Each structure stands twice: as structure tokens, then as C-alpha cells.
Regions:
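Aromatic- and acid-rich polysaccharide-binding/catalytic face
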Residues: 123, 127-128, 227-230
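Active-site beta->alpha N-cap acidic-glycine motif
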Residues: 12-14, 18-124, 131-135, 164-197, ...
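Aromatic/hydrophobic pocket-lining residues that form the small-molecule binding cavity
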Residues: 52, 56, 111, 147, ...
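Active-site-adjacent pocket scaffolds in enzyme catalytic domains
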Residues: 4, 12, 89-105, 170-286, ...
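Active-site and substrate-binding clefts of carbohydrate-active enzymes
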Residues: 313, 318-360
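Short glycine- and acidic-rich boundary segments immediately preceding or forming the N-terminal edge
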Residues: 1-17
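Short N-terminal edge-element motif at the start of the domain
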Residues: 147-152, 158-169, 173
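Active-site cleft segment of glycoside hydrolase catalytic domains centered on the general acid/base Glu
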Residues: 136-154
Length: 360
């Protein structure tokens, strides 16, 4: 790679910039024969708005304290002022429509700051696309061309926030989003088939939109790494639960994000134990990467955020564990012998082989 000369170069209208290689990145290393694989854990965040709850800044701090890097799937309309919402032309919907709120001006500025600092901390900025449309007329019903339009707008709102907001005095984001963006997660995990067909043209390396699979080593779909939410053992029940805050919520208080406060402590333990069950199963077993998905939310008194913080503190500094971003995991997988990955994919989650002979 050419060495960086230390000059920050603005791109386009100055919304983004080339500020050199991202800090904190290490190249993927090939496993040696007989070597036990690292235990990768990927924490990811859908939306990534910094609002009055200050969860983006909180989890940047937690990550820093626990040697973790993560993936933030930015919803690009969080960089579009409400007054300019007509700039968004969603597939199958009227201009300016969205299933989520556009940001306040203060939240937009705070989100810009957090996104820039997250990148400098070594975290990945992925995409959660724009309007968060689900079900009828949502991503699951979009054509390949409609997904392309959604992707192009996701790029554009990040690359042109200065023009769209008029905030010319704020510093640029420290990365080129066209080069930075390596994958995303579709709202409601809908539409992966056509999304993948669209994503290929952008050189994306992974997709995290699968509606859920077992805790096994990842493979590729259409040449793109498939990083699904995973089924984890639910504490005290003979069922499994998808590895995301929303799915624990659905099992605990159903449709309500404000359930019975008397149950919060028990639900917090249940959620934390659910994530840790999934971790222990593979840490002591197949070493398949663990994927935990979240939103910045305060459901049921904030218990899901506390559960994730507790899990990060519990696992990220353990021996052999690497809490990484999805792109960092893709780097590592790309560095491996495909035959080795094929062998790893044969393992059940709790199956712990004799590594010295299994990967010789």
C-alpha cells in the first residue's frame, strides 16, 4: 500500500475526507497448522443515532475500556435535516417519507461527531440504509434496482451532509465512505436476496441481513460473506432466541417496550445469560464467531443495553477472544485457506475437536 503523506484531503463538498489509514487495524493472519482459532465476537448497532440518551458515546467508552472494536450500521437519513427530508426518494414511497424520524439538528450534529470519533477509535461504519421500511412496500419487496437506489442515497447523504445541512464550519468525517463501506444490515432483516445482487456492484464484502441461522462458521452467499443473527440457547427454556435485543424483548414483554418494571431485573439476567450461553457454547466448542446485534434504545428501563455492556466486560478480555468489527472478521476469513474454513463449517456449535489434529 502507498504510504500516507500526512495530508488530510477533503472529498467533494468537504463532508468527508481522506485522513490516511484507519487507526487500530491489523491485517488478517492465516491460522498455523493445528492452531486453535481465535474466538471472534462482533457487536453491531443498527441506526447509530446519538440522541439525548447518549448511547453511541456510552458504548464507544465501553468498547475502549474492554479492548473492543464494533460495527455501527449508520442510518444515512440521520445526517439529513428534517427540513430537507424531501431529498430522500425511497423506493415505493413518496419523497420525504420514512418509517423512522429524521433527526433534530442537535442530534444530527452529535451523530456526526460520534461517527467520526468511532472511525478514529477503529470501529467500522457500515450501513442500515435509509428509511427503515418493512413489510408491505419494504425492502423485502424491492427490486435489485430499487435496492441500488437506496444504496446510492445511503452513500450520498453521508458524502453530502455539508451541502444538505449548511453546517460548513463543522469538520469533515475522516473517511471516504465510498471506500469505507463494506457491508450493511437491512431493516427488519428483509430483502437479502435482491440486496445481495445490488451490493455486488459496490464491492461489498459481507452482509448481515440474514433472518437468522445457527451458531456455525460463516460461509459466502453470492460471493459475499454471510454474517447472520444467530440462534442462542434461551435461559431456562427449551427454545433458542436470535442474538438481538429486539428478540429478547419479544420473548419478555411482547409488543411493549415498557413492560412490568418488577420483572426488569430478571429479564436483564435472562438476556445477559442468553448471550453468555451462546458465547460459552462456541468458546468451549467450535470457536464459531458470535454475532450480537443491537439498537440504541431504552426498552424496559434500558436492560438490553446493560446486558450488552455486561457481556462486553465479561468476554472481550478473555484469553483467545477478539471483539472485532464485521469488516475485521471478513479480513481474517479472507486470509484463511478455504479448505480450513470448510472443515470449520462442519462443526456443531458445542463441538470441540482436538485442534492439533483437526486443523493440521
Amino acid at each position: 500500500m502507498p504510504s500516507w503523506d500526512g495530508q488530510v484531503r477533503p472529498i467533494g463538498d468537504g463532508s468527508t475526507s481522506d485522513s490516511g489509514p484507519q487507526p487500530g487495524q491489523v491485517p488478517g493472519e492465516k491460522l498455523a497448522p493445528g492452531q486453535k482459532p481465535p474466538q471472534f465476537v462482533v457487536f453491531s448497532w443498527d441506526g447509530a443515532l446519538e440522541n439525548d440518551d447518549h448511547l453511541f458515546s456510552r458504548f464507544r467508552r465501553v468498547a475502549r475500556e474492554n479492548n473492543a472494536q464494533m460495527t455501527f450500521f449508520l442510518t444515512s437519513i440521520y445526517l439529513v435535516p428534517n427540513a430537507k427530508r424531501q431529498l430522500y426518494h425511497p423506493p415505493q414511497h413518496a419523497p420525504g417519507e420514512a418509517a423512522i424520524s429524521f433527526p433534530t439538528d442537535d442530534h444530527l450534529k452529535e451523530t456526526l461527531h460520534e461517527v467520526g470519533e468511532a472511525w478514529r477509535d477503529g470501529h467500522e461504519i457500515g450501513t442500515h440504509f435509509n428509511g427503515h421500511f418493512c413489510e408491505a412496500k419494504g425492502g423485502g419487496e424491492w427490486s435489485v434496482d430499487e435496492w441500488r437506489s437506496e444504496i446510492e442515497q445511503a452513500y450520498s447523504f453521508v458524502a453530502n451532509w455539508k451541502t444538505n445541512t449548511g453546517y460548513k464550519d463543522l469538520p469533515p468525517l475522516p473517511f471516504d465512505f465510498r471506500k469505507e463501506l463494506a457491508g450493511g444490515r437491512a431493516p427488519c432483516l428483509e430483502g437479502q436476496k435482491n440486496l445481495l445482487a445490488a451490493a455486488k456492484g459496490y464491492g461489498w464484502r459481507y452482509d448481515a441481513s440474514s433472518p437468522g441461522e445457527f451458531q456455525v462458521w460463516p460461509g459466502r452467499k453470492d460471493g459475499i460473506w454471510n454474517f447472520p443473527l444467530q440462534l442462542l440457547p434461551y435461559p431456562g427454556r427449551p427454545v433458542q432466541v436470535l442474538s438481538m435485543d429486539f428478540n429478547f424483548l419479544a420473548n419478555q414483554s411482547g409488543d411493549s417496550t415498557e413492560g412490568d418494571p418488577r420483572k426488569y431485573a430478571g429479564w436483564l439476567k435472562e438476556t445477559r445469560d442468553g448471550y453468555l450461553n451462546g458465547f460459552e457454547r462456541v468458546y468451549n466448542g467450535s470457536r464459531a464467531p458470535l454475532f450480537i446485534g443491537n439498537h440504541f434504545e431504552t426498552w424496559n428501563g434500558g436492560i438490553y443495553m446493560q446486558a450488552v455492556e455486561d457481556v462486553m466486560k465479561s468476554v472481550c478480555r478473555r484469553d483467545g477472544v477478539r471483539c472485532v468489527s464485521f469488516r475485521q472478521l471478513a479480513d481474517w476469513l479472507d486470509a484463511q485457506d478455504p479448505k480450513v474454513l470448510e472443515r470449520l463449517r462442519q462443526l456443531d456449535p458445542a463441538q470441540s475437536p482436538d485442534w492439533a489434529s483437526f486443523l493440521k
